[in-house]
């Protein structure tokens, strides 16, 4: 196995075509095909499946590519430092479900370290994508929640993907809504009282299983349910349609504004917010600092 072969696999996956990849690499297609066949034979892994429509990456190939990207990136960092003599910037990337406090923690991290010597990335995305991002080394850390309902399924998935879940916060469930909502001044709300109002939920795409829902009580038969892709749309729906969503009770007015509130839901449900990371891989200094910032919200959760 050579560094060149690893670079070839990354180029093919990006292009989706052996011919296009060969052009970008400035080598002949037969030479590229031979190099990939030799790599697959050596590793015993079918990385690509040839189809009439081009090249498709196999599930085993996705895992292989995750490691290949890491090796190539590390080599390029060493090359920049010791050969090219260029000062490379340290990188930190995090993926998360839609949590304003997790974004706020990221903001504080960037403020502390600055962007002259560091390169940051934040991905607020779907549950399954959070897990995939960590699995494929796109992100070092993934922020999500588990509870009694989804714990078994997600734990099995973490194990299969070589990930570990670490607990950060335990929260009760709150109803997040516009302050102009007729129930906004209540101390506690039941699901029965909410049945005439639209429940807002984040769309999970092709992995739209109850187990991947970002909101607890995902199996409840809501009379009115609206899916949204982003937080801004959801906030607009809260005002325009008197909608609501279920949340952790950790409220950050810095990002959402002061026009919204959280009212305790009459439920014994507990959600555990934590992070997933690659098993056996040490968290970087930036990653540890980010987790410290998130832990500061432990005492800010509504009781």
Language-model-detected regions and their locations in the chain:
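Hydrophobic hinge/microswitch elements
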Residues: 135-140, 145, 204-261
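Alpha-helical linker/hinge and terminal dimerization helices associated
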Residues: 42-43, 64-86, 93
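Flexible hinge/capping segments at coil-to-helix
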Residues: 157-199
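Short helix-boundary/capping micro-motifs
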Residues: 10-28
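Beta-alpha-beta core module
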Residues: 160-166, 171-172, 232-281
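Secondary-structure junction motif
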Residues: 102-108, 147, 151, 184-219, ...
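Central regulatory/effector-binding core of bacterial HTH transcription factors
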Residues: 89-152
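A short LG(V/I)-centered, amphipathic sequence patch enriched
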Residues: 40-57
């Amino acid at each position: 196995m050579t560094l060149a072969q690893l670079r070839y696999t990354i180029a093919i996956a990006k292009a989706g075509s052996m011919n296009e990849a060969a052009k970008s690499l400035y080598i002949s297609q037969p030479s590229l095909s031979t190099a990939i066949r030799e790599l697959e034979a050596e590793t015993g892994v079918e990385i690509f499946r040839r189809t009439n429509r081009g090249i498709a990456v196999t599930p085993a190939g996705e895992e292989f590519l995750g490691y290949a990207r890491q090796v190539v990136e590390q080599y390029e960092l060493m090359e920049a430092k010791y050969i090219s003599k260029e000062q490379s910037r340290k990188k930190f990337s995090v993926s998360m479900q839609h949590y304003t406090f997790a974004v706020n923690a990221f903001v504080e991290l960037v403020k502390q370290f600055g962007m002259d010597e560091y390169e940051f990335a934040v991905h607020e995305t779907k549950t399954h994508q959070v897990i995939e991002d960590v699995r494929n080394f796109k992100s070092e850390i993934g922020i999500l929640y588990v509870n009694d309902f989804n714990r078994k399924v997600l734990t099995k998935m973490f194990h299969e993907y070589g990930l570990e879940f670490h607990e950060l916060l335990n929260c009760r469930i709150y109803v997040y809504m516009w302050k102009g909502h007729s129930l906004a001044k209540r101390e506690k709300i039941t699901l029965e009282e909410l049945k005439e109002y639209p429940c807002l939920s984040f769309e999970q795409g092709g992995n739209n299983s109850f187990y991947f829902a970002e909101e607890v009580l995902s199996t409840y038969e809501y009379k009115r349910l609206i899916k949204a892709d982003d937080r801004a749309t959801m906030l607009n729906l809260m005002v325009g349609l008197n909608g609501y969503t279920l949340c952790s009770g950790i409220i950050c007015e810095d990002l959402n504004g002061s026009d919204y509130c959280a009212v305790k839901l009459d439920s014994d449900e507990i959600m555990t917010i934590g992070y997933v990371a690659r098993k056996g891989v040490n968290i970087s200094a930036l990653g540890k600092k980010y987790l410290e910032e998130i832990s500061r919200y432990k005492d800010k959760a509504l009781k």
